[in-house]
Amino acid sequence: MQSQTLLADTPLQSPYVEKQDFRDAMARLGSAVNIITTDGPAGRAGFTASAVCSVTDTPPTLLVCLNRSASVYSVFKQNQTLCVNTLAAEHESLSNLFGGKTPMELRFSAARWSTLATGSPILHGAVVSFDCQIGQIVSVGTHDIFFCQALALTRNDDSHGLAYFDRRYHSLLKQ
Protein backbone atom coordinates (compact mmCIF):
# COMPACT_ATOMS: atom_id res chain seq x y z
CA MET A 1 0.00 0.00 0.00
CA GLN A 2 1.38 3.38 -0.95
CA SER A 3 0.77 6.38 1.24
CA GLN A 4 1.93 9.93 1.32
CA THR A 5 2.11 12.24 4.30
CA LEU A 6 2.13 16.00 3.90
CA LEU A 7 3.43 18.12 6.73
CA ALA A 8 1.55 21.28 7.62
CA ASP A 9 4.30 23.48 6.19
CA THR A 10 4.56 21.51 2.91
CA PRO A 11 3.27 23.70 0.07
CA LEU A 12 0.65 22.05 -2.13
CA GLN A 13 1.31 22.27 -5.85
CA SER A 14 -2.28 21.41 -6.71
CA PRO A 15 -5.34 21.00 -4.53
CA TYR A 16 -6.33 17.79 -6.38
CA VAL A 17 -4.76 14.46 -7.21
CA GLU A 18 -3.80 13.88 -10.83
CA LYS A 19 -6.69 12.84 -13.09
CA GLN A 20 -5.07 9.55 -14.19
CA ASP A 21 -4.09 8.66 -10.62
CA PHE A 22 -7.70 9.21 -9.57
CA ARG A 23 -9.02 7.06 -12.43
CA ASP A 24 -6.55 4.28 -11.64
CA ALA A 25 -7.55 4.38 -7.97
CA MET A 26 -11.26 4.33 -8.82
CA ALA A 27 -10.67 1.22 -10.94
CA ARG A 28 -9.85 -0.51 -7.65
CA LEU A 29 -13.28 0.36 -6.25
CA GLY A 30 -15.41 -2.66 -7.11
CA SER A 31 -19.05 -2.06 -7.94
CA ALA A 32 -22.17 -3.67 -9.35
CA VAL A 33 -22.72 -3.33 -13.08
CA ASN A 34 -26.00 -1.70 -14.10
CA ILE A 35 -27.82 -0.83 -17.28
CA ILE A 36 -29.75 2.39 -16.82
CA THR A 37 -32.77 2.70 -19.13
CA THR A 38 -35.47 5.24 -19.92
CA ASP A 39 -38.42 5.57 -22.27
CA GLY A 40 -40.76 8.49 -22.65
CA PRO A 41 -41.51 11.59 -24.74
CA ALA A 42 -37.80 12.14 -25.52
CA GLY A 43 -37.33 8.53 -26.67
CA ARG A 44 -35.80 5.29 -25.43
CA ALA A 45 -32.17 5.11 -24.30
CA GLY A 46 -29.82 3.13 -22.10
CA PHE A 47 -26.23 3.04 -20.90
CA THR A 48 -23.97 0.94 -18.68
CA ALA A 49 -23.10 2.45 -15.30
CA SER A 50 -21.28 1.56 -12.13
CA ALA A 51 -21.79 4.99 -10.52
CA VAL A 52 -25.01 3.98 -8.76
CA CYS A 53 -25.76 3.71 -5.05
CA SER A 54 -28.46 3.81 -2.40
CA VAL A 55 -29.13 7.19 -0.78
CA THR A 56 -31.95 6.53 1.71
CA ASP A 57 -34.88 4.18 2.25
CA THR A 58 -37.27 6.96 3.32
CA PRO A 59 -38.25 7.73 0.64
CA PRO A 60 -36.49 4.89 -1.25
CA THR A 61 -33.89 6.80 -3.26
CA LEU A 62 -30.90 5.88 -5.42
CA LEU A 63 -28.40 8.06 -7.19
CA VAL A 64 -27.14 7.62 -10.74
CA CYS A 65 -24.26 9.65 -12.20
CA LEU A 66 -24.26 10.55 -15.90
CA ASN A 67 -21.76 12.60 -17.89
CA ARG A 68 -23.47 15.63 -19.40
CA SER A 69 -21.59 15.03 -22.68
CA ALA A 70 -23.02 11.50 -23.06
CA SER A 71 -25.17 11.02 -26.16
CA VAL A 72 -28.07 9.79 -23.98
CA TYR A 73 -27.94 12.62 -21.45
CA SER A 74 -30.73 14.80 -22.87
CA VAL A 75 -33.08 11.82 -23.24
CA PHE A 76 -32.77 10.95 -19.54
CA LYS A 77 -33.06 14.56 -18.41
CA GLN A 78 -36.18 15.18 -20.51
CA ASN A 79 -37.94 11.89 -19.66
CA GLN A 80 -37.39 12.37 -15.90
CA THR A 81 -37.72 8.59 -15.35
CA LEU A 82 -35.27 5.72 -15.41
CA CYS A 83 -34.77 2.12 -14.40
CA VAL A 84 -31.61 0.85 -12.68
CA ASN A 85 -31.19 -2.74 -13.91
CA THR A 86 -28.49 -4.48 -11.85
CA LEU A 87 -26.93 -7.10 -14.10
CA ALA A 88 -26.62 -10.82 -13.53
CA ALA A 89 -23.39 -12.66 -14.37
CA GLU A 90 -24.72 -13.77 -17.77
CA HIS A 91 -25.25 -10.14 -18.87
CA GLU A 92 -21.59 -9.27 -19.49
CA SER A 93 -22.01 -9.01 -23.29
CA LEU A 94 -25.13 -6.86 -22.81
CA SER A 95 -23.11 -4.56 -20.56
CA ASN A 96 -20.57 -4.13 -23.36
CA LEU A 97 -23.33 -3.32 -25.87
CA PHE A 98 -24.83 -0.63 -23.66
CA GLY A 99 -21.37 0.70 -22.76
CA GLY A 100 -20.28 1.37 -26.33
CA LYS A 101 -21.43 3.22 -29.43
CA THR A 102 -23.94 0.55 -30.49
CA PRO A 103 -27.17 2.08 -31.87
CA MET A 104 -30.06 2.04 -29.38
CA GLU A 105 -32.22 -0.33 -31.44
CA LEU A 106 -29.46 -2.97 -31.44
CA ARG A 107 -28.84 -2.53 -27.71
CA PHE A 108 -32.46 -3.16 -26.81
CA SER A 109 -32.96 -5.97 -29.35
CA ALA A 110 -30.26 -8.04 -27.59
CA ALA A 111 -32.45 -8.79 -24.52
CA ARG A 112 -36.05 -9.11 -23.32
CA TRP A 113 -37.67 -6.11 -21.67
CA SER A 114 -40.92 -5.23 -19.92
CA THR A 115 -42.17 -2.17 -18.03
CA LEU A 116 -43.53 -1.30 -14.60
CA ALA A 117 -44.75 2.06 -13.22
CA THR A 118 -42.76 4.60 -15.28
CA GLY A 119 -42.57 2.83 -18.63
CA SER A 120 -38.77 2.61 -18.47
CA PRO A 121 -37.43 -0.73 -19.79
CA ILE A 122 -37.04 -3.47 -17.15
CA LEU A 123 -34.45 -6.14 -18.07
CA HIS A 124 -35.69 -9.73 -17.79
CA GLY A 125 -33.25 -11.72 -15.65
CA ALA A 126 -31.68 -8.72 -13.90
CA VAL A 127 -30.66 -9.30 -10.29
CA VAL A 128 -32.88 -6.36 -9.36
CA SER A 129 -34.54 -3.53 -11.28
CA PHE A 130 -35.49 -0.23 -9.64
CA ASP A 131 -38.13 1.67 -11.62
CA CYS A 132 -37.65 5.33 -10.68
CA GLN A 133 -38.74 8.91 -11.11
CA ILE A 134 -35.93 11.47 -11.14
CA GLY A 135 -36.63 13.83 -8.24
CA GLN A 136 -33.56 16.06 -8.21
CA ILE A 137 -30.50 16.71 -10.39
CA VAL A 138 -27.23 18.08 -9.01
CA SER A 139 -24.28 19.07 -11.22
CA VAL A 140 -20.73 18.24 -10.11
CA GLY A 141 -17.83 18.71 -12.51
CA THR A 142 -18.56 16.93 -15.80
CA HIS A 143 -21.46 14.88 -14.44
CA ASP A 144 -25.01 15.26 -13.21
CA ILE A 145 -26.19 13.24 -10.23
CA PHE A 146 -29.76 12.05 -10.65
CA PHE A 147 -31.52 11.41 -7.33
CA CYS A 148 -34.19 8.86 -8.18
CA GLN A 149 -37.16 7.72 -6.10
CA ALA A 150 -38.04 4.04 -6.57
CA LEU A 151 -41.71 3.64 -7.53
CA ALA A 152 -41.54 -0.11 -8.24
CA LEU A 153 -38.98 -2.91 -8.31
CA THR A 154 -38.45 -6.50 -9.34
CA ARG A 155 -35.97 -8.99 -7.88
CA ASN A 156 -34.45 -12.23 -9.12
CA ASP A 157 -33.11 -13.90 -5.98
CA ASP A 158 -31.62 -16.85 -7.91
CA SER A 159 -29.20 -14.80 -10.05
CA HIS A 160 -25.47 -14.45 -9.62
CA GLY A 161 -24.32 -10.83 -9.73
CA LEU A 162 -21.89 -9.07 -12.05
CA ALA A 163 -19.23 -6.74 -10.64
CA TYR A 164 -16.58 -4.52 -12.22
CA PHE A 165 -13.20 -4.34 -10.50
CA ASP A 166 -9.72 -3.49 -11.81
CA ARG A 167 -11.18 -2.79 -15.27
CA ARG A 168 -12.55 -6.34 -15.58
CA TYR A 169 -15.84 -8.11 -15.01
CA HIS A 170 -16.20 -10.60 -12.15
CA SER A 171 -19.07 -12.96 -11.36
CA LEU A 172 -20.46 -12.77 -7.84
CA LEU A 173 -21.66 -16.21 -6.85
CA LYS A 174 -24.72 -16.52 -4.67
CA GLN A 175 -24.10 -18.77 -1.68
Swiss-Prot record:
The gene is rutF. It comes from Serratia proteamaculans (strain 568). Disulfide bonds: none annotated. This is FMN reductase (NADH) RutF. InterPro entries: Flavin_Rdtase-like_dom, NADH-dep_flavin_reductase, RutF, Split_barrel_FMN-bd. The keyword Flavoprotein applies. Catalyzes the reduction of FMN to FMNH2 which is used to reduce pyrimidine by RutA via the Rut pathway. Belongs to the non-flavoprotein flavin reductase family. RutF subfamily. It catalyses: FMNH2 + NAD(+) = FMN + NADH + 2 H(+). Keywords: Flavoprotein, FMN, NAD, Oxidoreductase. It holds the Pfam family Flavin_Reduct.
